[in-house]
Amino acid sequence: MDKRVSYCFPNNDTTSNPDAAAYVCIHSNAGGGRGTSYIALGTDYEQKFIGSDFVEKSNEMGNIINQKVAAATGLSQNSPINTPYLILFNKCPVPIAYMEIGFYDSSDLSILQSSSDEIGKAIAEGVDEYLKNN
């Protein structure tokens, strides 16, 4: 289990029930791109002890947050980055949104530097909307 996933549990005790409702990982990139996106898992993703709707719920939350961040910042809203497996998702007990917000080696950098409050608020609003709907 990824150490970060243990934060979903009281006192990091993974033998307990999780006390988090959602997990959001925030990442920025480099490599010539622009905009905001999220990692989306494929529908064939399966984990022992994880609910059958984990992929659907995680992808839904990522999509909502992605829309909110793009609207709040003017960053272009990119399609999800599809992957069949990502270690951070491994054994996560709650829906997870792995966000890719902006690129440090493009004009996105000025938005990341000047709009961090807006980005944080958009992420919070996205999680809130997701939780209200689920």
Predicted regions and their residues:
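Active-site-proximal helix/loop segments of hydrolytic enzymes
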Residues: 1-134
